[in-house]
Amino acid sequence: MKNKTRKPRISELDTLRGAAFLAVVLQHAIAHYFPLPATGLGDGVLLGVLLIASKFAVPLFVFMTGMSLFYSYDGEVPYLNFIRKRLKDIALPYLPWALLYAIEFQHVQLLDSSGWQKLGLMLFTGKASYHLWYVVMVFQLYLIFPPLQRLVKRVRPRSFAATMGVLALLFGLYLILMEQGGAIYRTAVAWDVPVLGPYFAKYLDRNALMYFFYFAMGAVAAFYVEQWRAWLIRLRYAILTAFAGMAIYLLYVVVAHFQLTPQVVIRYHDLGLLNPRMAVFLTLSVLTIYIVAMQWEQGAPGWLRKIMAWLGAYSYVAYLAHAYVLKYMERVADSLFGMDGSASARTLAAFIFSAAGAALIAYALRLAARSLKRIRQIKTQQANEKSAAL
């Protein structure tokens, strides 16, 4: 049996990847501007709306990872071959960017041994930059996928309804896990077990277990693509209403925690990913953006669909690059609007410039890689022709 099955392409995945990438860049642009003294109450509310609307990014990326893997691999998955491919596709692009961030952002000195130790720790933990934690987290899912896929094939229900029942049970367990996050952290700190202690304490935010439900939801969508789509369409009004209600509630909670005197201080700490309230909202967010993506595929102009699909195709390397680009695009935005200019306008400008710049860098790197590959092929062919002529 083939370990990877050729199936019809899930067209909305390209749109979803592009949307998730844009949402990540927007979140990080907001993170730079909201603490600044020039950010007023109106900016805080508007940026809060944008932040809430874009929080789907990480759970959607995890969902798409689960959906892509379980959709693509039906048969036996040879572990070493699978991991080798993931090292090539995920780790290989990650390493040079992590090195760049370690030197540029963390000022790691590689001329002494302690610098190399710091670099090694950063590579394994994703600490070289604020966005690289996701790569470390998602690679854990790749490491466990082959045995997990074999287990799921044996135990999963054969009907969509039964599978959704299991997913509902997993969601309940996930809410309990989110509720117990603090207890897990304190226990790990108290026990101080080597490796496992930091994994469940200092690095709990990049522990794949804390995101397992979104991966499971992606698996369900992969097993029953057509039923999944039909289910979302059937319940779209209920899902969209629940999403809107939760978004309004979260905005109320966030704004209620703004400090107004003696000066305005904007706070978004209520929007952390790992708590039960946000787990409910993020699940609704993934469902909502999937509904939007399906409608987008049906009704958006062709040129817009192509742009979003193009962003999706280059989203991983663009994701790796965007933090570096954002650092400089923030300066461009500040020069356009002034240091005392609208925080909202500067945020949106930095977001647009950074998303475009990171995507273009990813595109240029892929073109360069293809050109180098072609040059090597030509040289190899020429060498073979010379050998044959001798």
Model-derived features with residue positions:
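Membrane-interface helix-boundary motifs at transmembrane edges
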Residues: 6-10, 73-84, 149-160, 223-237, ...
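Functionally critical transmembrane alpha-helices in membrane proteins and complexes, commonly lining
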Residues: 11-72, 90-98, 124, 128
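Aromatic-anchored segments of alpha-helical transmembrane domains
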Residues: 22-29, 167-180, 242-257, 318, ...
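Interfacial loop-to-helix transition and helix-capping segments at the boundaries
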Residues: 48-58, 124-137, 178-214, 249-286
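Transmembrane alpha-helical segments and their boundary/interface "anchor" motifs
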Residues: 51-60, 72-105, 110-130, 141, ...
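Hydrophobic cores of alpha-helical transmembrane segments in multi-pass inner/ER membrane proteins
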Residues: 58-67, 133-145, 209-222, 281-291, ...
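Hydrophobic alpha-helical segments with transmembrane-like composition
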Residues: 104-109, 117-183, 198-217, 222, ...
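Alpha-helical transmembrane segments of multi-pass integral membrane proteins
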Residues: 246, 250-370
